[in-house]
Amino acid sequence: LNTTALSGASLGQVYLATRNGQQVIVKVKRPGIEKVVEKDLKVLMKIIPFAMKFVDPNLRFSIIPIMKQFVESMHEELDYTKESDNLKTIKKNMEPYDNVVIPNVHDDYSTKNILTMEYIPGIKVTDIQSLDEKGIDRQQLVIDVHKVFFTMLLKHSIFHADPHPGNISVKDDGTLILYDFGMIGRINDETRIKLVRLYLGLIEKNPPRTVNAMDELGMLA
């Protein structure tokens, strides 16, 4: 295990290690982080009623559901077995698509506090110079990123909900690599159909259809 962290975040750190001659990624949760998070969440929940006074009245109704979702997401992120399950589910869902790869999990070296995964190196999606040096079509890359995430969102019941540049890399052949499945989202069929209507309205530049879809989603309440 290389004790110098490759990257770090508020909940844990990521290290590079070797197992049976192959490089792996080891994600380690920070000691005692559960108590810190629970304390912070309690403080946050106490602040919300006061903060609501300064929020637009039209937006107040959405604050509590958003906070409940945030608390649930934080608890999931603290349990690496749940992240492992999320990764495996999304990996299986995306297997038919050859423009994206997701690391395998090493179950025998993973626990609630440690997650060991296959190491798949790649180029950051924001590293324009390296992408150009490899001859990767950046316009096609943007299309592929949209396709991958919209496929998860509109076709499957679970999707990667943290698509920032640090969680998306590119192989030399242009294949996308997705990392970090601690934050995921779930969507039911009813909401998915409403989202499809919204996107169709936007694509067709049809204001009435778009507004109707937004109303169905509760975006105009």
Language-model-derived ranges and their functions:
Residues 1-221:
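Conserved catalytic cores of large enzyme domains
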